Regions:
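C-terminal and inter-domain tail/linker signature
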Residues: 2-136
Length: 136
């Protein structure tokens, strides 16, 4: 006896596979960031990716918190890694769906108070097209 498997089953597998691939992007993002490996971090992003952070608003007010494109991301993170050599993130939660990665982490920097952060990565075709950071 054969049992017919609805096409939806394949669709569900595709959804799960995409979510797992996106979660893997999140894991690679943390590994690259914590290693201060700028090129590995940037390789995860699309060339025209956008990034929002309240820290950008403070450090570079003219940006209104946004940088766009890999060259701008490179400059932003190079500055952060140079200024804050002890900067690293402790993962609290990492989850993903087919379009986004949701990350919660604790930002640690020597001589600064720890900061709990939420970040969303939007992913398309295996690359981050946008990232948004949220914290108090």
């Amino acid at each position: 006896m054969q049992i017919a498997v609805p096409d939806q089953a394949n669709g569900m597998t595709d959804v799960m596979d995409t979510a797992e691939r996106n979660k893997a992007i999140g894991r690679r993002w943390f590994a690259a960031f914590n290693a201060h490996d700028l090129e590995a971090l940037l390789a995860l992003y699309a060339e025209d990716a956008e990034h929002f952070s309240p820290k950008l608003k403070v450090r570079m007010p003219a940006t209104e918190g946004w940088v766009r494109g890999v060259p701008a991301l490179r400059a932003w993170w190079r500055d952060a890694f140079d200024r804050l050599p002890t900067l690293h993130y402790e993962v609290v939660k990492l989850t993903a769906d087919t379009e986004q990665v949701f990350m919660e982490y604790i930002r640690h920097v020597e001589d600064e108070a720890d900061l709990r952060v939420g970040e969303v990565l939007e992913v398309r075709d295996g690359r981050i097209i946008a990232s948004r950071v949220y914290h108090g």
